[in-house]
Amino acid sequence: MRVIASSIRKGNVLEQDGKLYVVLSAENIHPGKGTPVSQIEMRRISDGVKISERYKTTDQVEKATIEERNYSFLYEDGEGFHFMEPESFDQVQVTKDVVGNSAPYLQEGMVVKLSMHDTVAVAITLPQRATLEVVETEPVTKGQTASSSYKPAVLSNGVRTAVPPHVGVGTRIVVLTEDGSYVERAKD
């Protein structure tokens, strides 16, 4: 499907010269003089090479047809990450380039959305929140309940974050998968 360059957003998949590219960032630039342009940074899906393209905002580009489907995370090995479609039990392997910064938050059985082009996964969307255990932090200090200062902590997936003073080692907490920030104590 052909679209104008100014309508391209992060996460879109473009087809150019027979290859697929996932958009990492898209910015419309309107200089004081001259034609407005769209600056688009993309990663080639086949080999992970990053490129930067500049189009006039009115140029037509080819947007690939993408289908989003739910998959359950199974495991990770040297070849990549393995997911299974719950209804058909079809398994798909996803490269480390596609998973990217989401890797630490993947937990066995977690349901994620994979954006598929034919049979190739081009992007992954995690649930907004994940429940993890605090494995390392400073001891709980009595009387600091009114303080709004946070202390550093290491989670069970190895991610570092900041937690309130009342959270101790062994506490299960909910964090945002986008940036690893603390949301609340887990209710389980």
UniProtKB/Swiss-Prot annotation:
GO terms for cellular component: cytoplasm. InterPro entries: Elong-fact-P_C, NA-bd_OB-fold, Rib_uL2_dom2, Transl_elong_fac_P/YeiP, Transl_elong_KOW-like, Transl_elong_P/YeiP_cen, Transl_elong_P/YeiP_CS, Transl_elongation_fac_P. It holds the Pfam family EFP. Transmembrane segments: none annotated. It is found in: Cytoplasm. One of its GO terms (molecular function) is translation elongation factor activity. PANTHER family: ELONGATION FACTOR P (PTHR30053), TRANSLATION ELONGATION FACTOR KOW-LIKE DOMAIN-CONTAINING PROTEIN (PTHR30053:SF14). This is Elongation factor P. It comes from Rhodopseudomonas palustris (strain HaA2). The lineage of its organism: Bacteria, Pseudomonadati, Pseudomonadota, Alphaproteobacteria, Hyphomicrobiales.
